[in-house]
Amino acid sequence: MIYIREGYTITDLHCGVTCSSNNKTVHAGFNKTFESIKSQLAILLDQLGNRPVHCVGHSLGGAIANLAAVWIRSNYKIPVKLYTFGSPRVGFNAYAMQTETSLHGIYRAVHRSDPVPMVPVWPFVHAGKEYRLSTCVSLTGASHMMDGKRLGNYTYFLKFHGNRLSISGAVRHCSFRKAMM
């Protein structure tokens, strides 16, 4: 399992577009962040061999996990599943469609009142089926946090939607810091 945690800097607001590793249009800021950790991922993946990979991320980490999953599948030809929680939209429709066809499962969990999955706006779109975790309708920053009882909602999602993570070997964590612009 590769877990990419959230992180926030002013460069997260950079919403230009660029081409991803699969030559589709994606958010430039997310792609720049992914590019900054790609060499670390390559070292890790070279050690794992041909074992399946689960890419997991929350918030911005979900966007980076999305880009990582596509890159891993394209370059390592191993089964990859993607699990995101409260992730923003990553790319245009062509990117989302290619992501859906190349990965071995996309599980995109959102809290109904979390504003992060609503950005960036069109023409960015999500890949994969959405799993809503609450019936709340108010927009609050607290809806986006993965702490306390809200974390329980995410755990419920993994346990009861048939997405148990069976992992052999060590669980690896990859965190990142974006380079300043």
Give the ranges of each region predicted by the language model.
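Non-catalytic, mobile gating and regulatory segments of ester bond hydrolases
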Residues: 1-56, 60-181
